[in-house]
Regions:
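Rhodanese-like catalytic fold shared by cysteine-dependent sulfurtransferases
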Residues: 1-10, 14-17, 24-57, 63-98
Length: 98
């Protein structure tokens, strides 16, 4: 297993990171990290080459970081450069950025 978690602070202080919320559309529309795009887990898993380029870095999150860690590790094994945002949306809600 590849451990590739990264802190929320680190990502949100970057210049134009590509942040992907892998939660379902309904949950995303209830609230999400500022600047995040929504690609639900099963859409991303089923068609990752349609959404991602191997030339970019992606920062993924879900509700608590578990599901995004799983898919991030899987995508990395396919040659993509992805990182899991540690703690997911729950961490964002208690952060200074919310």
């Amino acid at each position: 297993m590849i451990l590739n978690s990264i802190s929320l602070d680190y990502v949100l202080n970057m210049n134009n990171p590509i942040i992907i919320d892998i939660r379902d559309n309904y949950t995303y529309n209830l609230g999400h990290i500022k600047g995040a795009i929504n690609i639900p887990y099963y859409n991303l898993l089923g068609n990752y080459s349609h959404y991602l380029s191997k030339n970019d870095k992606y920062y993924l999150y879900c509700e608590n970081g578990r599901q995004s860690l799983n898919i991030s590790n899987r995508l990395n094994s396919f040659g993509y450069n992805t990182f899991n945002i540690d703690g997911g949306y729950e961490r964002y809600l208690i952060s200074k950025y919310y």
